[in-house]
């Protein structure tokens, strides 16, 4: 039997092409993920810098100014310092839970960004249940905090973990009910559909005006979920040293630091998507394209404008939680639980019933 060498070469070339296609397919899948991770990292660095500058302004002092221009590289300097510190592990604690806890907290929050639309269909995963995917994923983070507190074998850490779990359960329900009210107005659980539903009537079509009570409840609940003052009981310094972070150092302590700002950023992004119209400007932008001769209907220009508007709304909203940190005193644990169960839960239920009734009457 004579084997034609040209046939063998043809088969080999086809197999190489198939393998190259697979490699390119994998690279094409990784590009948006890597881009999103880099964007989130830069966003967190900007939040840290903004918080320090705003805090310095509120307290009438000078903020960071030596690490880079206007101190913008101070967060990188702090991160480098944490990387170089020794990673201590308690000898009497559960080392597995102690090591896994910070990773669970960070990864669960990172996954929430996959359903956030930064522009017109510029979203990593346009799921039909996008908003409830975020709620389900965000409820995993307190599990990591509880594991960290238990694995530290420290009474302060364990109490901090228990507080984090109790606080998350108390405020997750009002948050979910507010999201359900928004979904009823938009007839969809997709984040993209919710933004598009707000674009029909421009500025006055934002859910902020249609759901003012839900917006206030969502704001308070998201602050509690982020463990920001006045809801930072899981890491209250005067009572629990540093809560579930007490025994941590080095990169693991840095992961908790990153997780808190990741959670703050994702909550602000969801406020923008659910209540502030997302990527829609709602104001005609004729002046800038006409000056530079840019096609306003172009896809690239529209995408860039959408990203800019989403981030601008998000960072403007971030002033509220940053200013709140230096304005309000910390609540007691009983006050925190009473606020969640006795006030926010009935209000969010009433808001949901009103929304349902209005939707039924409009049919």
Curated annotation (Swiss-Prot):
Transmembrane segments annotated in the record for this chain: 30-50, 98-118, 127-147, 165-185, 203-223, 248-268, 300-320, 336-356
A Pfam family: NADHdh
Gene Ontology CC terms: chloroplast thylakoid membrane
GO MF assignments: oxidoreductase activity, acting on NAD(P)H, quinone or similar compound as acceptor; quinone binding
Membrane topology qualifier: Multi-pass membrane protein
Enzyme Commission code(s) on record: 7.1.1.-
Gene Ontology BP terms: aerobic respiration; photosynthesis, light reaction
Top-rank EC class of the record's enzyme: translocase
The protein's name in its UniProt record: NAD(P)H-quinone oxidoreductase subunit 1, chloroplastic
């Amino acid at each position: 039997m004579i084997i034609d060498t040209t046939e063998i070469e043809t088969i080999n070339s086809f197999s190489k092409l198939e393998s190259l296609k697979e490699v390119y397919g994998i690279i094409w899948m990784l590009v948006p993920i890597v881009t999103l991770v880099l964007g989130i990292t830069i966003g967190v660095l900007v939040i840290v810098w903004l918080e320090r500058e705003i805090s310095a302004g509120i307290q009438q002092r000078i903020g960071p100014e030596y690490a880079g221009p206007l101190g913008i590289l101070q967060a990188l300097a702090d991160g480098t310092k944490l990387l170089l510190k020794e990673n201590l592990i308690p000898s009497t604690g559960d080392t597995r839970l102690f090591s896994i806890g910070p990773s669970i907290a960070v990864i669960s929050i990172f996954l929430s960004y996959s359903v956030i639309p930064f522009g017109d269909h510029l979203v990593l995963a346009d799921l039909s249940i996008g908003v409830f995917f975020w709620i389900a994923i965000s409820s995993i983070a307190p599990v990591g905090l509880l594991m960290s507190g238990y694995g530290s074998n420290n009474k302060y850490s364990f109490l901090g973990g228990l507080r984090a779990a109790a606080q998350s359960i108390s405020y997750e329900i009002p948050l979910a009910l507010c999201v359900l009210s928004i979904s009823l107005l938009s007839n969809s659980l997709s984040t993209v559909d919710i933004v598009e539903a707000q674009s029909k009537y421009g500025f006055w079509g934002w859910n902020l005006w249609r759901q003012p009570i839900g917006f206030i409840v969502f704001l308070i609940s998201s602050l509690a979920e982020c463990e920001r003052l006045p809801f930072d009981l899981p890491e209250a310094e005067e009572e629990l040293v540093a809560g579930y972070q007490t025994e941590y150092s080095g990169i693991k302590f840095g992961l908790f630091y990153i997780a808190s700002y990741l959670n703050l950023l994702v909550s602000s992004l969801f406020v923008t998507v659910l209540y502030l119209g997302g990527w829609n400007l709602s104001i005609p932008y004729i002046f800038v394209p006409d000056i530079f001769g840019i096609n306003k209907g172009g896809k690239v220009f529209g995408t860039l404008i959408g990203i800019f508007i989403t981030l601008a709304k998000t960072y403007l909203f971030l002033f509220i939680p940053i200013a709140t940190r230096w304005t309000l005193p910390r609540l007691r644990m009983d006050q925190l639980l009473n606020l969640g169960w006795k006030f926010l839960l009935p209000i969010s239920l009433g808001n949901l019933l009103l929304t349902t009734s209005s939707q039924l009457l409009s049919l």
